[in-house]
C-alpha cells in the first residue's frame, strides 16, 4: 500500500529545505539508481555521489554539502537517513489490522480487551490475559494464562507470549518468536542416572519500544524474571536464556546466543553469531564484532572482537597444524630460556 503527495508537501512534513521542482507527485521510496520520476531517494555520504549524479529520482534527500551534486530536486536535511525513514513511513504506511476478534479465534471469557484490539484467525488467548488498547494479535499467535500484551503492541503470526510474561507499550514480536519457554535447567541425578528438570517459575518482562525478530527466543526465568529493558532490538534467531537481563537500547544481531544469568549493559551493539557465556556481566556501551566468543565479564565500554577471518584453505590448514604444535614450541622455548639463565614470558604459564 502506498500514499502519494507532492515533493513540496513532503518537504513540509519533513522540515526539509526544497531546492527544485516541488510540484511533482511522489508515491514511493527507492534506491538512488532504482528510483524513477515518482520516487524519493537519499544520499548519506560522498561515497554515493556517483549514484546520486545518475539518479532519476523525483527528489533526493541530501545534506547541504551535496546539494550541488543532485541532478534534480533536492530535499536538504541534516540527516538524510533518518529523514528517509520518515519518507518510507509516509509513502508506505503499514496496513493495520481491523479492530475486533476474528470468529476463528479462541479467546477466554475473562480476557481484558482494551479499545481497538485486533485478534486474528486461529489465535488462542487463554485465561487472565490483558490486551492493551490498540494491540494486535496476528493469526495463529498464542498468549498464555495471565500474560499481558501492552498498549499498541503487536504479536506476529504463530508467535508465542507464554503464561505470566508481560510486554510494555509499542512492542513488536515477529512471526515464530517464542517468549517465555522454559529455561534450560536440569540437575544431575545420583550415580549418573540422568537429569531432573528444574521448574522454571519466573517470567519474562519486556520494556517499552522493544522489537524481537522472527524465530527469536527469550526463555522465562527460573525463579525471577528474564528482563528485556526498554528500546532493545533483537534480530531474527537471537536466543536469550533464562535469568538474563538485556539493558536499555541494546541491539543484538541475528544468530547470537546469550547463556543463562548473564547481564548485558545498556547501549551495547552486538553483532551476529556472537556467543556469550553464562553468569557474566557486560558493561554499558560495549560493541562486540560478529562471531565473537565472550567467555568472561567485560567491565569497560569499547569495541571487542575475536572472530577468525576467512583465509585460503591451504593457509588455514597450515595454521591449524601450527596451532596444535604451540605446546611443543612453548616447552622448547622454555627449556632454552632455562638453559641460558633467561627469564621471559615463555617461562610462565598464565590462564588469563
Curated annotation (Swiss-Prot):
Keyword check for Acetylation: no
Pfam families in the record: Hexapep, Hexapep_2, LpxD
Active site: 242
CDD domains in the record: LbH_LpxD (cd03352)
Documented EC number(s): 2.3.1.191
Family: Belongs to the transferase hexapeptide repeat family. LpxD subfamily.
Protein name: UDP-3-O-acylglucosamine N-acyltransferase
Organism, as annotated: Halorhodospira halophila (strain DSM 244 / SL1)
Amino acid at each position: 500500500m502506498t500514499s502519494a503527495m507532492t515533493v513540496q508537501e513532503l518537504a513540509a512534513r519533513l522540515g526539509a529545505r526544497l531546492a527544485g521542482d516541488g510540484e511533482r507527485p511522489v508515491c514511493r521510496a527507492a534506491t538512488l539508481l532504482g528510483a524513477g520520476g515518482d520516487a524519493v531517494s537519499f544520499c548519506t555520504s560522498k561515497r554515493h555521489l556517483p549514484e546520486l549524479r545518475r539518479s532519476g529520482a523525483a527528489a533526493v534527500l541530501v545534506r547541504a554539502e551535496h546539494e550541488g551534486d543532485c541532478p534534480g530536486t533536492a530535499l536538504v536535511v541534516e540527516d538524510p537517513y533518518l529523514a528517509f525513514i520518515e519518507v518510507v513511513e509516509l509513502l508506505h504506511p503499514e496496513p493495520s489490522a481491523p479492530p475486533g476478534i476474528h470468529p476463528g479465534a479462541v479467546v477466554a471469557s475473562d480476557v481484558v480487551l482494551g479499545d481497538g484490539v485486533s485478534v486474528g484467525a486461529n489465535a488462542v488467548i487463554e485465561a487472565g490475559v490483558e490486551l492493551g488498547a490498540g494491540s494486535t494479535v496476528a493469526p495463529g499467535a498464542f498468549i498464555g494464562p495471565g500474560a499481558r500484551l501492552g498498549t499498541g503492541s503487536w504479536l506476529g503470526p504463530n508467535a508465542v507470549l507464554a503464561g505470566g510474561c508481560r510486554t510494555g507499550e509499542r512492542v513488536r514480536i515477529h512471526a515464530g518468536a517464542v517468549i517465555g519457554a522454559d529455561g534450560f535447567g536440569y540437575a544431575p541425578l545420583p550415580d549418573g542416572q540422568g537429569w531432573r528438570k528444574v521448574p522454571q517459575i519466573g517470567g519474562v518482562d519486556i520494556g517499552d519500544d522493544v522489537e524481537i525478530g522472527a524465530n527469536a527466543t527469550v526463555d522465562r526465568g527460573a525463579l525471577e524474571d528474564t528482563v528485556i529493558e526498554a528500546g532493545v532490538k533483537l534480530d531474527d534467531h537471537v536466543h536469550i536464556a533464562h535469568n538474563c537481563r538485556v539493558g536499555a537500547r541494546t541491539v543484538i544481531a541475528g544468530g547470537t546466543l546469550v547463556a543463562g544469568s548473564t547481564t548485558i549493559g545498556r547501549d551495547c551493539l552486538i553483532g551476529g553469531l556472537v556467543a556469550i557465556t553464562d553468569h557474566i556481566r557486560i558493561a554499558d556501551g560495549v560493541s562486540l564484532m560478529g562471531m565473537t566468543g565472550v567467555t568472561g565479564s567485560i567491565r569497560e565500554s569499547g569495541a571487542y572482537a575475536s572472530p577468525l577471518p576467512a583465509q585460503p584453505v591451504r593457509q588455514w590448514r597450515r595454521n591449524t597444524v601450527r596451532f596444535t604444535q604451540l605446546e611443543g614450541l612453548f616447552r622448547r622455548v622454555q627449556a632454552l630460556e632455562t638453559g641460558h639463565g633467561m627469564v621471559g614470558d615463555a617461562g610462565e604459564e598464565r590462564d588469563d
